[in-house]
Amino acid sequence: LHCIGWSGSFIVSAILITLIIPLAWMLKAPMYQNPNTISTSQPALGFKQVLVIAKNHKPFWFLALGFFVCGFQVVFIGIHLPSYLIDHGFNATTGTVFLALVGLFNIVGTYTAGWLGGRYSKPHLLMWLYGLRGIAIIAFLILPLSIWTIYAFGIIMGLLWLSTVPLTNGIVANMFGIKYLTMLSGIVFFTHQVGSFFGGWLGGLNHDLTGNYNAIWIVSIALSAFAVLVHFWVDEEHVIHD
């Protein structure tokens, strides 16, 4: 930002995102199918039919509630932790390094979560992830605030940051099949974005009213406990078979 400013940073980000587009060609379905191949799959369900099935499947909504918690926590911390650090006498660079550590270790955490999800119960792994988030936040607030505790918190939160995504999408795929994954994971992700809105908005509102983030930290911890609880009722039972 000091070198090229906000507009330049956005331009660089746009260029990097554009470079991803050619990778979409690697995901193309085969253009031709052997005419002698006999399909044994079930007839595709309609959009409304799938929505009705999902609407009546309680574990799907428990999963969505858990993803709401994910959105609330990551956006609250991502937006407001740098301000929290400034309030406690640290400079802006400290917050920047914290976010960089989150981004770096998020790569490791997300990949590892996906690998573990192929070997162990995904709902149980999500219970562990949300529980560890709550413990990490409690430790961060209780321990004396220093550069080392800040950076350690950044590493831990990075490992837990979006590690929920492959597990959550994997559960949706197991429930309803990959044919309907994009639609139904989009609905679950919508709840994540609703949580993101409230995490960002309530954090700012609380700070404006009280001058601190104490209440939202408590809410984040309580939401971790809530997420652990709701995932107790999430299973990977096949609702729709491909």
Residue ranges and their predicted role:
Residues L1-G5, L85-I86, L116-G117, L202-G211:
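Interfacial helix-cap and linker-helix signal at transmembrane-aqueous boundaries
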Residues L1-Y32:
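Helix-loop-helix hairpin linking two adjacent transmembrane segments in secondary transporters
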Residues K28-Q49, I240-D242:
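Flexible cytoplasmic inter-helical loops of multi-pass small-molecule transporters
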Residues K55-A113, G199:
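Extracytoplasmic gate region of multi-pass secondary transporters
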Residues L162, M175-T210, S220:
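A late C-terminal transmembrane helix in Major Facilitator Superfamily
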